[in-house]
Structures are given as C-alpha cells and as structure tokens.
Amino acid sequence: MAETDQLHDIFTLQGELNDGIFKKQDIRGPDGQALNMSGIRQALERGELGPNGLPNLWLRNYLRALQSEAAELEQELLWKWWSKDKIDLQNIRVEIVDLMHFLTSLALAAGLSADEFHRLYTAKHRVNQERQEKGYSQATKDEQDNKGIV
C-alpha cells in the first residue's frame, strides 16, 4: 500500500466538503458571488481582517460549530461516578472526528495549508516541550514564546 500524506488528504477532503456545502446551500460572499474556501483565503490575502470580513465571519462560524461538537462529545462522557453506565466509545470516536472536521475548517479559514499547519504545530510543540522542561505554571506563564512562532 502506498504511503500518503494523511494530513494533506484531510485538508483537501475538508476543503472540498466545505465548498460543496457552500454550493448546495447557495452561500454567497459579500460581493454576491458563490462562496468557496479559496474566496476566504483570498480575502485574507487582501487583508480583510476586520470584524465584518469574510475570514472573521467564517472563523467565528467554524469555531461555533467546533464548540457545538465539543459539547456533543461532553454529553457522551460519563461523570456520575456512582453510575454503572459505560461510555459509547464508537460514538465518542465519531464525535472526535467531527471535531477534526471543524478544526480543519478553522485552519483553512485562517489560510493554513496542511504543510503550514504541520510547521506551526511542530514549532508550538517545541515551545510546549520547553515550557514543561522549565516547570510551566500560571506563575511562570509567558506568552512571548508564542510570538516567535510564525
């Protein structure tokens, strides 16, 4: 079996799904043209970063969807320690995949490709490792190390 770039595949599939939803629902941009993920990225490149800009609108929409899916996942998790219920692991896994759908949509709406996402992830991972090595806590929290991640 050939090795594939799975993160790239996820980003491609999600972009295609989003474009299909925009088309099916006849969602349009402020210019009246049919909306697609490329249009959101182009708005980013034009610097349309204000509260009424297309990127902000769709980042907000995808964040709300992500929060909704997180709430659905939370409903699947048991908290009554006195209960004899068991978790539905299959549905929990599906809810986690739903979270990935909207996390990927957020990344795409922020103009990230799979490669850019991976690069930022590994840079932030190094920051997190360094924080742990230094005994990270609220008292030592310094967001300046995040500023160097570009």
Summary of predicted features, one role per range:
Residues 1-150:
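Flexible "arm" and connector segments at domain edges
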